[in-house]
Regions:
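C-terminal alpha-helical cap/extension of soluble enzyme domains
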Residues: 8-14, 34, 38-39, 204, ...
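Secondary-structure boundary/capping positions in well-ordered alpha/beta enzyme cores
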Residues: 74-75, 133, 162, 185, ...
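Catalytic alpha/beta core domains of metabolic enzymes, predominantly
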Residues: 128-129, 140-249
């Protein structure tokens, strides 16, 4: 696949589940159709938002297969394959390739983080198992390691099949240093929804995030205008978008369940324990007010 397809606004797709916790193929198909209709540039599966680490290898394989089939090559698919063990991550990478995904991604070692060499040994095993473009997932909030941008960049560029990185951090200075060292050899996707326009100034070619499940069209519209020089569009939109995030992030899955049902007639189901919803009951008027806020703020 052409490297230039890895850009733009990608929802970190939610994984609809049935009451018994099994992924719901029908609702997944409906969500894929809705996101493509709304203009998603690609779909990122089975990450934190998609509850990937809480699903079995069998379930993750099925979700990947169903999504690839539903997308039918209309948008690229990136499957997150990070798991508790390197062996499981490698197996999931093979499954993603066999299912027809266009790229793979993975967080670093979950729970066990000895040093930077162990992190990149984990990545190396994943990247070498198939020929798909590989996008390691750097999640700054969960990393206990410190390293310089130069050290990180050198190890990143040495990985097999590396094409980019999902970089989830509020530190855009650090992101800019990474971009300055790696240039176009590493395509950076920002993972901080609340900074997706700001991240473009630090070298991000796109954004992958939870809130694009609801507002991919609006965010794509504003980002496109911003990149063409319409700074006022971003200045108007970003505070509204940040407000919407701030009042819903404490119960993100509960909010998404109500909002996606209202907007797309998609039921994502409940969360998988130990992940829980917070508020549980969102009034339609609350959600409608946020829909109106974002629509008005995104008008160019």
């Amino acid at each position: 696949m052409q490297n230039d397809l890895f850009q733009g606004i990608w929802p970190a797709m939610l994984t609809p589940v049935k009451p018994n916790g099994e992924p719901d193929s029908r609702q997944i198909q409906k969500l894929v159709e809705a996101l493509i209709r709304e203009g998603a540039d690609g779909l990122y599966l089975l990450g934190t938002t998609g509850m990937g680490p809480l699903l079995s290898e069998r379930q993750r394989r099925s979700v990947c297969e169903w999504t690839v089939e539903a997308a039918d090559k209309r948008v690229p698919i990136m499957a997150h394959v990070g798991s508790m063990t390197t062996q499981s991550s490698v197996a999931l990478a093979r499954d993603a390739a066999q299912a027809g995904a266009d790229a793979i991604s993975a967080v670093g070692p979950i729970y066990y983080q000895q040093n930077i060499d162990s992190v990149f040994a984990h990545y190396r095993s994943i990247g070498s198992v198939c020929a798909l473009p590989f996008f390691p997932y750097h999640f700054a909030a969960s990393s206990r390691l410190t390293f310089s941008p130069q050290q990180f960049s050198e190890k990143l560029l040495a990985l097999p099949h590396v094409a980019g990185i999902k970089y989830t951090s509020l530190d855009l200075y650090e992101m800019g240093l990474l971009h300055g060292i790696c240039g176009e050899r590493v395509r950076i996707f920002s993972g901080a929804d609340e900074l997706f326009c700001h991240a473009a100034l630090s070298g991000a070619v796109g954004a992958i995030g939870s809130y694009y499940n609801l507002w991919v069209r609006e965010c794509k519209r504003v980002r496109k205008a911003f990149l063409k020089g319409n700074v006022n569009a971003a200045r108007r939109f970003m505070p509204a978008f940040q407000h919407a995030i701030s009042v819903t992030v404490h119960d993100m899955w509960g909010f998404f369940r109500k909002a996606l049902a209202m907007k797309f007639d998609v039921d994502i189901g409940d969360t998988i324990a130990p992940l829980t919803s917070g508020k549980n009951v969102w009034r339609e008027s609350e959600v409608s007010d946020l829909f109106e806020l974002i629509e008005n703020a995104s008008t160019i």
